[in-house]
Amino acid sequence: MGFIGKSVLVSLVALWCFTSSVFTEEVNHKTQTPSLAPAPAPYHHGHHHPHPPHHHHPHPHPHPHPPAKSPVKPPVKAPVSPPAKPPVKPPVYPPTKAPVKPPTKPPVKPPVSPPAKPPVKPPVYPPTKAPVKPPTKPPVKPPVYPPTKAPVKPPTKPPVKPPVYPPTKAPVKPPTKPPVKPPVSPPAKPPVKPPVYPPTKAPVKPPVSPPTKPPVTPPVYPPKFNRSLVAVRGTVYCKSCKYAAFNTLLGAKPIEGATVKLVCKSKKNITAETTTDKNGYFLLLAPKTVTNFGFRGCRVYLVKSKDYKCSKVSKLFGGDVGAELKPEKKLGKSTVVVNKLVYGLFNVGPFAFNPSCPK
Protein backbone atom coordinates (compact mmCIF):
# COMPACT_ATOMS: atom_id res chain seq x y z
CA MET A 1 0.00 0.00 0.00
CA GLY A 2 1.41 3.34 -0.99
CA PHE A 3 1.53 6.60 0.79
CA ILE A 4 -1.63 7.87 -0.86
CA GLY A 5 -3.57 4.75 0.15
CA LYS A 6 -2.50 5.07 3.78
CA SER A 7 -3.44 8.74 3.96
CA VAL A 8 -6.87 8.01 2.47
CA LEU A 9 -7.43 5.18 4.96
CA VAL A 10 -6.48 7.38 7.95
CA SER A 11 -8.79 10.17 6.84
CA LEU A 12 -11.61 7.66 6.34
CA VAL A 13 -11.17 6.26 9.88
CA ALA A 14 -11.12 9.75 11.36
CA LEU A 15 -14.27 10.74 9.52
CA TRP A 16 -16.02 7.57 10.66
CA CYS A 17 -15.04 8.20 14.30
CA PHE A 18 -16.32 11.74 14.16
CA THR A 19 -19.66 10.83 12.68
CA SER A 20 -20.18 7.94 15.11
CA SER A 21 -19.41 10.16 18.12
CA VAL A 22 -21.81 12.84 16.95
CA PHE A 23 -24.53 10.31 16.33
CA THR A 24 -24.14 8.61 19.76
CA GLU A 25 -24.16 12.00 21.46
CA GLU A 26 -27.43 12.85 19.79
CA VAL A 27 -28.94 9.55 20.86
CA ASN A 28 -27.90 10.02 24.48
CA HIS A 29 -29.24 13.52 24.49
CA LYS A 30 -32.60 12.26 23.26
CA THR A 31 -32.79 9.78 26.10
CA GLN A 32 -32.21 12.54 28.68
CA THR A 33 -34.75 15.03 27.32
CA PRO A 34 -37.99 13.48 28.81
CA SER A 35 -37.01 14.47 32.39
CA LEU A 36 -36.18 17.99 31.34
CA ALA A 37 -38.29 20.93 30.38
CA PRO A 38 -40.38 20.68 27.21
CA ALA A 39 -37.89 22.90 25.42
CA PRO A 40 -36.26 21.18 22.45
CA ALA A 41 -33.16 19.20 23.31
CA PRO A 42 -30.91 19.95 20.35
CA TYR A 43 -30.58 23.61 21.30
CA HIS A 44 -29.21 22.89 24.85
CA HIS A 45 -26.31 20.80 23.90
CA GLY A 46 -24.03 22.39 26.61
CA HIS A 47 -24.75 22.70 30.38
CA HIS A 48 -28.39 22.05 31.13
CA HIS A 49 -29.98 24.33 33.82
CA PRO A 50 -32.55 22.78 36.16
CA HIS A 51 -36.18 23.66 35.74
CA PRO A 52 -37.30 26.34 38.31
CA PRO A 53 -40.45 24.64 39.63
CA HIS A 54 -38.60 21.52 40.83
CA HIS A 55 -36.96 22.64 44.11
CA HIS A 56 -36.34 19.20 45.48
CA HIS A 57 -33.22 18.90 43.34
CA PRO A 58 -30.56 20.87 45.19
CA HIS A 59 -28.02 20.29 42.52
CA PRO A 60 -28.25 21.00 38.87
CA HIS A 61 -29.06 18.14 36.45
CA PRO A 62 -26.07 15.99 35.70
CA HIS A 63 -24.39 16.71 32.40
CA PRO A 64 -25.26 14.45 29.57
CA HIS A 65 -21.65 13.66 28.74
CA PRO A 66 -21.28 10.32 30.52
CA PRO A 67 -22.90 8.46 27.63
CA ALA A 68 -20.12 9.75 25.44
CA LYS A 69 -18.06 6.71 26.40
CA SER A 70 -19.83 4.55 23.83
CA PRO A 71 -18.31 6.29 20.81
CA VAL A 72 -14.89 5.45 22.13
CA LYS A 73 -15.32 1.72 21.41
CA PRO A 74 -16.07 1.94 17.71
CA PRO A 75 -12.86 3.80 16.94
CA VAL A 76 -10.94 1.03 18.71
CA LYS A 77 -12.57 -1.79 16.73
CA ALA A 78 -12.71 0.02 13.44
CA PRO A 79 -8.99 0.50 12.91
CA VAL A 80 -8.33 -3.15 13.75
CA SER A 81 -10.37 -4.68 10.92
CA PRO A 82 -9.25 -2.43 8.02
CA PRO A 83 -5.53 -3.22 8.34
CA ALA A 84 -6.32 -6.93 8.04
CA LYS A 85 -7.74 -6.59 4.53
CA PRO A 86 -6.22 -3.51 3.01
CA PRO A 87 -8.47 -2.39 0.19
CA VAL A 88 -6.63 -1.07 -2.71
CA LYS A 89 -9.25 1.46 -3.73
CA PRO A 90 -11.09 2.92 -0.70
CA PRO A 91 -14.82 3.40 -1.37
CA VAL A 92 -15.88 6.98 -0.81
CA TYR A 93 -19.67 6.47 -1.13
CA PRO A 94 -20.74 5.04 2.31
CA PRO A 95 -19.39 7.91 4.49
CA THR A 96 -21.43 10.50 2.61
CA LYS A 97 -24.79 8.72 3.15
CA ALA A 98 -24.43 8.05 6.92
CA PRO A 99 -24.19 11.65 8.23
CA VAL A 100 -27.08 12.91 6.08
CA LYS A 101 -29.95 10.80 7.48
CA PRO A 102 -29.56 11.18 11.31
CA PRO A 103 -29.59 15.06 11.50
CA THR A 104 -32.80 15.37 9.45
CA LYS A 105 -34.98 13.04 11.55
CA PRO A 106 -34.65 14.59 15.10
CA PRO A 107 -35.97 18.10 14.23
CA VAL A 108 -39.02 16.63 12.46
CA LYS A 109 -40.29 14.50 15.35
CA PRO A 110 -40.78 16.43 18.61
CA PRO A 111 -39.65 14.67 21.80
CA VAL A 112 -43.26 14.03 22.83
CA SER A 113 -43.09 10.30 22.22
CA PRO A 114 -42.70 8.10 25.30
CA PRO A 115 -39.14 7.59 26.51
CA ALA A 116 -39.21 3.89 25.79
CA LYS A 117 -39.38 4.16 22.00
CA PRO A 118 -36.43 6.49 21.23
CA PRO A 119 -33.80 3.97 22.40
CA VAL A 120 -35.25 1.35 20.01
CA LYS A 121 -35.26 3.52 16.90
CA PRO A 122 -31.78 4.97 16.97
CA PRO A 123 -30.09 3.91 13.73
CA VAL A 124 -27.10 2.22 15.13
CA TYR A 125 -26.68 -0.08 12.11
CA PRO A 126 -25.83 2.41 9.38
CA PRO A 127 -22.65 3.59 11.09
CA THR A 128 -21.55 -0.01 11.59
CA LYS A 129 -22.35 -1.03 8.02
CA ALA A 130 -20.41 1.81 6.52
CA PRO A 131 -16.97 0.62 7.65
CA VAL A 132 -17.86 -3.05 7.15
CA LYS A 133 -18.75 -2.86 3.46
CA PRO A 134 -15.45 -1.47 2.24
CA PRO A 135 -13.34 -4.36 3.56
CA THR A 136 -15.79 -6.98 2.25
CA LYS A 137 -15.01 -6.15 -1.30
CA PRO A 138 -12.65 -8.67 -2.82
CA PRO A 139 -9.14 -7.51 -3.35
CA VAL A 140 -8.77 -5.80 -6.59
CA LYS A 141 -7.22 -8.09 -9.08
CA PRO A 142 -4.13 -6.79 -10.68
CA PRO A 143 -4.94 -5.35 -14.04
CA VAL A 144 -4.79 -8.02 -16.66
CA TYR A 145 -2.91 -6.70 -19.53
CA PRO A 146 -3.58 -8.06 -22.95
CA PRO A 147 -0.97 -10.47 -24.15
CA THR A 148 1.80 -8.61 -25.63
CA LYS A 149 1.73 -9.12 -29.30
CA ALA A 150 4.83 -10.36 -30.88
CA PRO A 151 6.67 -7.57 -32.50
CA VAL A 152 5.25 -7.32 -35.92
CA LYS A 153 7.98 -7.36 -38.35
CA PRO A 154 7.51 -4.86 -41.07
CA PRO A 155 6.72 -6.62 -44.31
CA THR A 156 9.88 -7.27 -46.03
CA LYS A 157 9.68 -5.55 -49.28
CA PRO A 158 10.75 -7.60 -52.21
CA PRO A 159 14.13 -6.67 -53.40
CA VAL A 160 13.70 -3.74 -55.61
CA LYS A 161 14.80 -4.74 -59.00
CA PRO A 162 16.92 -2.19 -60.64
CA PRO A 163 14.97 -0.47 -63.34
CA VAL A 164 15.47 -2.22 -66.58
CA TYR A 165 16.21 0.35 -69.12
CA PRO A 166 15.81 -0.39 -72.76
CA PRO A 167 19.07 -1.19 -74.35
CA THR A 168 20.66 2.02 -75.21
CA LYS A 169 21.06 2.18 -78.85
CA ALA A 170 24.48 2.87 -79.93
CA PRO A 171 24.71 6.33 -81.28
CA VAL A 172 24.00 6.06 -84.89
CA LYS A 173 26.89 7.49 -86.59
CA PRO A 174 26.29 8.97 -89.92
CA PRO A 175 27.34 6.48 -92.47
CA THR A 176 30.87 7.27 -93.09
CA LYS A 177 31.56 6.80 -96.64
CA PRO A 178 34.37 4.41 -97.01
CA PRO A 179 37.35 5.91 -98.57
CA VAL A 180 36.91 5.67 -102.22
CA LYS A 181 39.43 3.24 -103.30
CA PRO A 182 40.53 3.30 -106.81
CA PRO A 183 38.66 0.68 -108.69
CA VAL A 184 40.67 -2.37 -108.29
CA SER A 185 40.14 -4.45 -111.25
CA PRO A 186 39.48 -7.97 -110.19
CA PRO A 187 42.16 -10.34 -111.09
CA ALA A 188 41.53 -11.45 -114.51
CA LYS A 189 40.24 -14.90 -114.13
CA PRO A 190 41.16 -17.25 -116.80
CA PRO A 191 38.24 -17.63 -119.11
CA VAL A 192 36.12 -20.41 -117.86
CA LYS A 193 35.75 -22.86 -120.54
CA PRO A 194 32.29 -24.19 -120.84
CA PRO A 195 32.07 -27.84 -120.12
CA VAL A 196 32.53 -29.75 -123.22
CA TYR A 197 29.65 -32.06 -123.66
CA PRO A 198 29.64 -34.76 -126.19
CA PRO A 199 27.99 -33.50 -129.30
CA THR A 200 24.33 -34.00 -128.88
CA LYS A 201 22.84 -35.70 -131.77
CA ALA A 202 20.26 -33.69 -133.48
CA PRO A 203 16.86 -35.23 -133.11
CA VAL A 204 16.24 -37.34 -136.05
CA LYS A 205 13.24 -35.86 -137.69
CA PRO A 206 11.09 -38.23 -139.52
CA PRO A 207 11.24 -37.68 -143.17
CA VAL A 208 8.88 -34.89 -143.95
CA SER A 209 6.50 -36.23 -146.40
CA PRO A 210 4.52 -33.78 -148.41
CA PRO A 211 1.25 -32.90 -146.67
CA THR A 212 -1.23 -35.47 -147.54
CA LYS A 213 -4.52 -34.01 -148.48
CA PRO A 214 -7.45 -35.53 -146.63
CA PRO A 215 -9.45 -37.76 -148.82
CA VAL A 216 -12.08 -35.71 -150.44
CA THR A 217 -15.39 -37.22 -149.50
CA PRO A 218 -18.09 -36.66 -151.98
CA PRO A 219 -20.85 -34.40 -150.73
CA VAL A 220 -23.57 -36.29 -148.95
CA TYR A 221 -26.75 -35.69 -150.69
CA PRO A 222 -30.11 -36.88 -149.52
CA PRO A 223 -30.67 -40.34 -150.76
CA LYS A 224 -31.76 -40.24 -154.25
CA PHE A 225 -34.92 -42.10 -154.81
CA ASN A 226 -35.16 -44.08 -157.76
CA ARG A 227 -38.40 -43.85 -159.46
CA SER A 228 -40.75 -45.79 -157.28
CA LEU A 229 -44.35 -45.95 -156.26
CA VAL A 230 -45.70 -44.04 -153.25
CA ALA A 231 -46.88 -45.59 -149.97
CA VAL A 232 -48.12 -43.41 -147.02
CA ARG A 233 -48.33 -44.64 -143.41
CA GLY A 234 -49.74 -43.15 -140.15
CA THR A 235 -52.04 -43.67 -137.13
CA VAL A 236 -55.48 -42.38 -136.09
CA TYR A 237 -56.66 -41.83 -132.46
CA CYS A 238 -59.69 -40.68 -130.50
CA LYS A 239 -58.80 -37.90 -128.07
CA SER A 240 -59.91 -38.03 -124.43
CA CYS A 241 -62.66 -35.76 -123.16
CA LYS A 242 -60.26 -34.22 -120.66
CA TYR A 243 -57.88 -32.95 -123.37
CA ALA A 244 -60.33 -32.60 -126.25
CA ALA A 245 -59.66 -28.88 -126.58
CA PHE A 246 -55.86 -29.29 -126.76
CA ASN A 247 -53.57 -30.48 -129.53
CA THR A 248 -52.29 -33.43 -127.57
CA LEU A 249 -52.74 -37.17 -127.50
CA LEU A 250 -52.70 -37.54 -123.71
CA GLY A 251 -55.28 -40.15 -122.82
CA ALA A 252 -56.09 -40.81 -126.52
CA LYS A 253 -57.05 -44.26 -127.77
CA PRO A 254 -56.48 -45.74 -131.26
CA ILE A 255 -59.55 -46.04 -133.53
CA GLU A 256 -60.19 -49.09 -135.68
CA GLY A 257 -61.91 -48.69 -139.08
CA ALA A 258 -61.23 -44.94 -139.54
CA THR A 259 -61.06 -43.86 -143.25
CA VAL A 260 -58.03 -42.01 -144.64
CA LYS A 261 -57.91 -40.50 -148.19
CA LEU A 262 -54.94 -39.57 -150.44
CA VAL A 263 -55.44 -36.79 -153.00
CA CYS A 264 -52.76 -35.94 -155.61
CA LYS A 265 -53.27 -32.87 -157.76
CA SER A 266 -52.05 -33.19 -161.33
CA LYS A 267 -53.52 -33.12 -164.78
CA LYS A 268 -55.81 -35.71 -163.43
CA ASN A 269 -57.03 -35.80 -159.84
CA ILE A 270 -55.91 -39.07 -158.38
CA THR A 271 -57.33 -40.37 -155.10
CA ALA A 272 -56.95 -43.43 -152.91
CA GLU A 273 -58.49 -44.50 -149.59
CA THR A 274 -57.80 -47.03 -146.82
CA THR A 275 -58.91 -47.85 -143.24
CA THR A 276 -57.07 -48.37 -139.95
CA ASP A 277 -56.57 -51.63 -138.11
CA LYS A 278 -57.26 -52.28 -134.43
CA ASN A 279 -54.09 -50.36 -133.46
CA GLY A 280 -55.20 -47.34 -135.50
CA TYR A 281 -52.38 -47.96 -138.03
CA PHE A 282 -52.82 -47.53 -141.77
CA LEU A 283 -50.64 -48.01 -144.90
CA LEU A 284 -52.08 -46.21 -147.93
CA LEU A 285 -50.74 -47.30 -151.36
CA ALA A 286 -51.03 -44.64 -154.03
CA PRO A 287 -52.12 -45.55 -157.59
CA LYS A 288 -49.33 -46.74 -159.86
CA THR A 289 -49.62 -43.55 -161.84
CA VAL A 290 -48.12 -41.63 -158.86
CA THR A 291 -44.37 -41.89 -158.34
CA ASN A 292 -41.98 -40.43 -155.83
CA PHE A 293 -41.07 -37.67 -158.24
CA GLY A 294 -44.50 -36.10 -157.95
CA PHE A 295 -45.33 -36.67 -154.23
CA ARG A 296 -45.21 -32.95 -153.40
CA GLY A 297 -48.63 -32.40 -154.91
CA CYS A 298 -50.27 -35.08 -152.75
CA ARG A 299 -52.15 -34.61 -149.41
CA VAL A 300 -53.70 -37.04 -146.93
CA TYR A 301 -57.05 -36.29 -145.22
CA LEU A 302 -58.87 -37.79 -142.29
CA VAL A 303 -62.31 -38.60 -143.63
CA LYS A 304 -64.55 -40.40 -141.11
CA SER A 305 -64.65 -42.63 -138.05
CA LYS A 306 -66.40 -45.90 -137.50
CA ASP A 307 -67.20 -44.85 -133.89
CA TYR A 308 -70.05 -42.39 -133.90
CA LYS A 309 -69.09 -41.21 -130.35
CA CYS A 310 -65.74 -40.05 -131.67
CA SER A 311 -66.26 -38.81 -135.25
CA LYS A 312 -65.38 -35.11 -135.30
CA VAL A 313 -62.12 -34.51 -137.20
CA SER A 314 -59.60 -32.50 -135.16
CA LYS A 315 -56.98 -30.11 -136.43
CA LEU A 316 -54.11 -32.20 -135.05
CA PHE A 317 -51.24 -32.30 -137.63
CA GLY A 318 -53.52 -31.03 -140.42
CA GLY A 319 -55.85 -33.99 -140.59
CA ASP A 320 -58.76 -31.69 -141.41
CA VAL A 321 -57.06 -29.66 -144.20
CA GLY A 322 -54.71 -32.28 -145.59
CA ALA A 323 -51.27 -33.24 -144.31
CA GLU A 324 -48.14 -33.10 -146.45
CA LEU A 325 -46.17 -36.27 -147.17
CA LYS A 326 -42.77 -36.55 -145.41
CA PRO A 327 -40.30 -39.07 -146.88
CA GLU A 328 -38.67 -41.55 -144.46
CA LYS A 329 -34.95 -40.71 -144.20
CA LYS A 330 -33.72 -43.66 -142.21
CA LEU A 331 -31.46 -45.82 -144.32
CA GLY A 332 -32.84 -49.23 -144.95
CA LYS A 333 -36.32 -48.15 -143.93
CA SER A 334 -37.14 -45.70 -146.67
CA THR A 335 -38.75 -48.31 -148.93
CA VAL A 336 -41.22 -51.08 -148.51
CA VAL A 337 -41.98 -54.02 -150.86
CA VAL A 338 -45.60 -54.92 -151.38
CA ASN A 339 -46.58 -57.64 -153.86
CA LYS A 340 -43.04 -57.59 -155.24
CA LEU A 341 -43.36 -53.90 -155.98
CA VAL A 342 -41.06 -51.36 -154.36
CA TYR A 343 -42.76 -48.37 -152.79
CA GLY A 344 -41.12 -45.30 -151.46
CA LEU A 345 -42.27 -44.80 -147.79
CA PHE A 346 -43.77 -41.47 -146.60
CA ASN A 347 -45.14 -40.42 -143.16
CA VAL A 348 -48.16 -38.31 -142.09
CA GLY A 349 -50.02 -37.58 -138.83
CA PRO A 350 -50.79 -38.86 -136.34
CA PHE A 351 -54.41 -37.85 -136.77
CA ALA A 352 -57.20 -37.73 -134.21
CA PHE A 353 -60.97 -37.36 -133.83
CA ASN A 354 -62.62 -35.31 -131.05
CA PRO A 355 -65.05 -37.26 -128.85
CA SER A 356 -68.62 -36.27 -128.07
CA CYS A 357 -68.26 -35.55 -124.34
CA PRO A 358 -71.25 -35.03 -122.03
CA LYS A 359 -71.53 -31.49 -120.77
Swiss-Prot record:
Annotated localization: Secreted, Cell wall
Glycosylation sites: 71, 75, 79, 82-83, 87, 91, 95, 99, 103, 107, 111, 114-115, 119, 123, 127, 131, 135, 139, 143, 147, 151, 155, 159, 163, 167, 171, 175, 179, 183, 186-187, 191, 195, 199, 203, 207, 210-211, 215, 219, 226, 269
UniProt name for this protein: Non-classical arabinogalactan protein 31
Region (Disordered): 31-215
Residues recorded as bearing 4-hydroxyproline in the entry: 71, 75, 79, 82-83, 87, 91, 95, 99, 103, 107, 111, 114-115, 119, 123, 127, 131, 135, 139, 143, 147, 151, 155, 159, 163, 167, 171, 175, 179, 183, 186-187, 191, 195, 199, 203, 207, 210-211, 215, 219
GO biological process, one term: response to jasmonic acid
Biased composition (Pro residues): 67-215
Source organism per UniProt: Arabidopsis thaliana
Feature: compositional bias, Basic residues: 44-66
Disulphide-bridged cysteine pairs: none
Induction: Down-regulated by wounding, abscisic acid (ABA) and jasmonic acid (JA).
Family membership: Belongs to the non-classical AGP family.
Tissues showing expression: Expressed in vascular bundles of roots, leaves, sepals and stamen filaments, and pistils but not stigma.
Record note on modification: Hydroxylated on numerous prolines in the proline-rich region.
GO CC annotation: extracellular region; plant-type cell wall; plasma membrane; plasmodesma
Transmembrane domains' residue ranges: none
A Pfam family matched in the record: Pollen_Ole_e_1
Sequence repeat extents: 90-109, 122-141, 142-161, 162-181
Primary location group: secreted
